[in-house]
Amino acid sequence: MFRYKQVMVIRKDLKLSKGKMAVQVAHGAVTAALKVQKEKPEWFKAWFHEGQKKVVVKAENERELFELKAHAEKLGIPTALIRDAGLTEIPPGTITCLAVGPAPEELVDKVTGHLKLV
């Protein structure tokens, strides 16, 4: 049973290729995990040792990512907002993904529980 999880939220409106989406999600997962390891080491250790549960969901647009980020931060959940370098499919600086946690599952669900899986 998982008590901690990490959720990556990808923008639907960008219509990223599967490969591009995978890379953006990976950037988010690593960046946020390192942030949590530093800011909430007890959460990181628990998440890491129970199998590192990750979920990928979708948001409508950039505005929704910022709303989710603000909600997560109000609850004390570290986040990572990912901006693309713009070398392939989209313009430089485009915000593609928000990573939430890893954090206690019940907290993360308050932020992302209503979003649909990719």
UniProtKB/Swiss-Prot annotation:
Key word Thylakoid present: no
Cross-referenced PANTHER family: PEPTIDYL-TRNA HYDROLASE 2, PEPTIDYL-TRNA HYDROLASE 2, MITOCHONDRIAL
InterPro entries: Pep_tRNA_hydro_II_dom_sf, Pept_tRNA_hydro_arch, PTH2
Broad class of the protein's primary localization: cytoplasm
Protein name: Peptidyl-tRNA hydrolase
Summary of the function given for this chain in its UniProt record: The natural substrate for this enzyme may be peptidyl-tRNAs which drop off the ribosome during protein synthesis.
Alphabetical keyword list: Cytoplasm, Hydrolase
Similarity remark: Belongs to the PTH2 family.
Enzyme class: hydrolase
Coiled coil (residue ranges): none
Keyword check for Nucleotide-binding: no
Catalytic activity, reaction form: an N-acyl-L-alpha-aminoacyl-tRNA + H2O = an N-acyl-L-amino acid + a tRNA + H(+)
One GO molecular-function entry: peptidyl-tRNA hydrolase activity
Enzyme Commission numbers on file: 3.1.1.29
Recorded superkingdom: Archaea
GO biological process, one term: translation
UniProt GO cellular component terms: cytosol
Localization in the cell: Cytoplasm
NCBIfam families, A to Z: arch_pth2 (TIGR00283), PRK04322.1 (NF003314)
Pfam families per UniProt: PTH2
Gene name linked to the record: pth
